[in-house]
Each structure stands twice: as C-alpha cells, then as structure tokens.
Amino acid sequence: MTSTINKPLDGEGSVQVKQDPKVNIEEGALVIAVYGKGGIGKSTTSSNLSAAFSKLGKKVLQIGCDPKHDSTFTLTHKMVPTVIDILEEVDFHSEELRPTDFMFEGFNGVMCVESGGPPAGTGCGGYVTGQTVKLLKEHHLLEDTDVVIFDVLGDVVCGGFAAPLQHANYCLIVTANDFDSIFAMNRIVSAIQAKAKNYKVRLGGVVANRSKDTDQIDKFNNRTGLKTMAHFKDVDAIRRSRLKKCTIFEMEPTEDVVEVQNEYLSLAKNMLDNVEPLEGTPLKDREIFDLLGFD
C-alpha cells in the first residue's frame, strides 16, 4: 500500500502559522525583520537601529519575538511583561486589555512590545507573533508608525519563527566574520527566498557585527549576491551599553561610541531610502565549507 503526501503551500501545514490576510501591517510603514545566529547580537542591533530611526524623527515600534523577552530592555531600561503573559492573565480576552498593558515607551519615544512565547517544548512561537500583530491592530497602534522592527529568535527558520517574514519589507541578517555565523546566514537566505515567492519580504542586506575584519563575509557576499549594509567592530562600549541597560546613543560620546552611533544612523538612512532589494542565491552546505577559511 502506498500513499502520496502533497507538498504544502507556503504558510500551510500548521494552523498556527498560516497568516490571516486581515492581520497585515499597514502599507507605508517600513517593516524590517532582523535575523541571525543565536547570540550574534540581534537584540543589540535591533534596539540601536530603532534608536537611530527615532533620532531621524521616525515613529518606531520594536517587537521582540523571543520567549526570553530581552529584546527591548536597553530601550526601556527594564524587562517588560510579554503579550502572552498579559493575555493569559485575562484568559485571552484581548478586548479587556489597554495598550499600556503590553506596549511600553522606551528611549526617545521608541515603542516596545515583547511578544514572549510558549513554555519550552510547547506551542508555536510564530503563533504568538501573529497574535501580537493582531492585538496591535485591534488597538489601532500601527496606524501612525513609520518603522516596525521584528527582533527574531536565533536562526530558527521553521514556519513559526519565519512568521515575521510574512509582514516584513526587508530582512537584515546579523553575522560575525566566522564560519558558524555565515553558515546560519545561508540558511536564513534560503528561508527568505522561499517566503519571497508569496510575500513582499526581500533581502535588505548583511550587518557585520563584533568583527574587526569582514573577509569571510565578503567571500560569502560575492558568491551569493549579498551586500554588507553596516559594519560594527568589536567595540567594548557596545558590550558595556548592554550592561548599563541602555542604547549606544545614551553612552558617553567617546570617539568609538560616536563612530558606532554614526554607523547606525547611516544604516537607518539607507533603509529609509528604499534600499535596492537583493536577490541572494544560497549555497549548498558543502559549497560553504569549501568557500570559507584560509588557503
């Protein structure tokens, strides 16, 4: 006896992650999803980029999509409650919530939301992200927003954590100049290209982080058609800003700090200028293995 399993269309295969067409972020807002290997500095990058957009006069919303809910603490200077925790308190009757229950104002007016997630080993993080966007729309909190940044958990590219790609205009990939980070970046490129067939998301570019040099990133970019949009060296002030629970824009303006601030402002300006989307071509695993490293 044989049976045939049909390949599900994008967004199908899980009731939890199929996007409700009514839960779209309004046209006009610049929506960016930030991905990268776990621990590479996505939250630091997202928060400082949000701060940079706000410095340019934009109304910014940052949505943390990690159960650790630590995406926005450098903006708010505290750990804020998550959407999933707040919804549980009202037995998921969202009509009982006020915006101040789950949205918090951070540095320079950046609005912050932590979607949170289900307990480890249960549920779907993508479902939580979808519910967060739905809640924001129900309360009309996206209507006057210029920029939305999704800070996404690790390099997981399953249907659930690929959910922010369904809302985004661009994806930025944060990487270091090492094999593991670039290997993860390649998987993310594959996921974005798959989503781009049915959604508006496109590759915006690469953010080189915690790296003095970019030679390995450059090799990968040259082979795949990607482009480095910003380069943040391993500056100790960035590490200290996390310990101080603040953005790089709140640090003492030393030469290193000002250089980092200007790089974030430049990245924000470039993204606002309708950056040319990239048509990246992911490599096979063996190709990356052979490409990277030294002769």
Curated annotation (Swiss-Prot):
Pfam families xref list: Fer4_NifH
Residues given in the record as Mg(2+) binding sites: S43
Gene3D superfamilies: P-loop containing nucleotide triphosphate hydrolases (3.40.50.300)
Keyword ATP-binding found: yes
GO molecular function: 4 iron, 4 sulfur cluster binding; ATP binding; metal ion binding; oxidoreductase activity, acting on iron-sulfur proteins as donors; oxidoreductase activity, acting on the CH-CH group of donors, iron-sulfur protein as acceptor
NCBIfam families xrefs: DPOR_bchL
Entry protein name: Light-independent protochlorophyllide reductase iron-sulfur ATP-binding protein
Organism: Prochlorococcus marinus subsp. pastoris (strain CCMP1986 / NIES-2087 / MED4)
Tree of life domain: Bacteria
Alphabetical UniProt keywords: 4Fe-4S, ATP-binding, Chlorophyll biosynthesis, Iron, Iron-sulfur, Magnesium, Metal-binding, Nucleotide-binding, Oxidoreductase, Photosynthesis
Catalyzed reaction equations: chlorophyllide a + oxidized 2[4Fe-4S]-[ferredoxin] + 2 ADP + 2 phosphate = protochlorophyllide a + reduced 2[4Fe-4S]-[ferredoxin] + 2 ATP + 2 H2O
Cofactor(s), names only, from the UniProt record: [4Fe-4S] cluster
CDD domains, per the entry: Bchl-like
Binding site residues for ATP: G39, I40, G41, K42, S43, T44, K68, N209, R210
Annotated pathway: Porphyrin-containing compound metabolism; chlorophyll biosynthesis (light-independent)
Residues the entry annotates as binding [4Fe-4S] cluster: C124, C158
Cofactor note as given: Binds 1 [4Fe-4S] cluster per dimer.
EC number: 1.3.7.7
Enzyme class: oxidoreductase
Biological role stated in the UniProt entry: Component of the dark-operative protochlorophyllide reductase (DPOR) that uses Mg-ATP and reduced ferredoxin to reduce ring D of protochlorophyllide (Pchlide) to form chlorophyllide a (Chlide). This reaction is light-independent. The L component serves as a unique electron donor to the NB-component of the complex, and binds Mg-ATP.
GO biological process, one term: photosynthesis, dark reaction
Family under the similarity heading: Belongs to the NifH/BchL/ChlL family.
Quaternary structure (record): Homodimer. Protochlorophyllide reductase is composed of three subunits; ChlL, ChlN and ChlB.
